[in-house]
């Protein structure tokens, strides 16, 4: 195993804590009952990830979601619930990222739409941090028009940064993304969603910042 020089982090479920199940359950207030959730499970899951990734116009996705809600529901009502996907951002992780940048190149690679990202940037600012302080570069699906786990998004990030996959440690909480990164040559860590601190690899790189 080569010495680590670069760190690549997913955002949702890795840097920020997100409770996807509570978002789906919150849709009950808009008429998406338990029965509907069971019947339309695949569709609801697809629409949520489609909204997050930002490769389909948000208005198109929201309109499709609206068809599952009770009459009188507006897209604004849905957006208010989907804002919960911005999640809870532990300031301790942001503090750690700043320290990690003193020793490593640190990049963010996330499937996220423009609305959620701008709200996330605002949340970081409220906690006293800018993306420039936290990351050497940010790579987002909605801006790149590519999404994980497609090899193209890893290729473009590598070309733009000049990073060496063999010396890159990659953290992602979705198995297909972690595997795609591994196939690309990264040293991948499949993160237990919202529990980054439990992983030995995270603990080890943070120990290195104290040496």
Indicate where each model-derived feature is located.
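Asp-based, Mg2+/Mn2+-dependent phosphohydrolase catalytic module
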Residues: 2-4, 113-114, 120-211
């Amino acid at each position: 195993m080569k010495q680590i020089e670069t760190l690549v982090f997913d955002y949702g479920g890795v840097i920020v804590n997100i409770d996807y199940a509570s978002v789906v359950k919150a849709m009950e207030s808009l008429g998406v009952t338990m029965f509907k959730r069971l019947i339309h499970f695949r569709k609801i899951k697809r629409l949520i990830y489609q909204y997050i990734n930002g490769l389909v116009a948000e208005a198109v996705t929201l309109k499709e979601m609206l068809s599952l809600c009770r009459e009188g529901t507006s897209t604004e009502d849905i957006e208010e619930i989907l804002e919960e996907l911005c999640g809870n951002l532990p300031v301790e992780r942001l503090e750690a990222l700043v320290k990690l940048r003193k020793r490593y190149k640190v990049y963010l690679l996330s499937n996220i739409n423009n609305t959620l990202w701008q709200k996330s940037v605002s949340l970081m600012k409220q906690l006293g941090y800018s993306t420039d302080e936290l990351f050497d570069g940010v790579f987002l699906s909605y801006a790149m028009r590519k999404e994980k786990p497609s090899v193209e998004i890893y290729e473009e990030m590598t070309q733009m940064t000049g990073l060496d996959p063999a010396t890159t440690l990659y953290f992602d909480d979705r198995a297909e993304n972690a595997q795609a990164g591994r196939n690309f040559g990264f040293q991948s860590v499949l993160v237990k969603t919202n529990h980054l601190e439990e992983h030995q690899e995270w603990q080890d790189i943070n120990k290195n910042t104290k040496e």
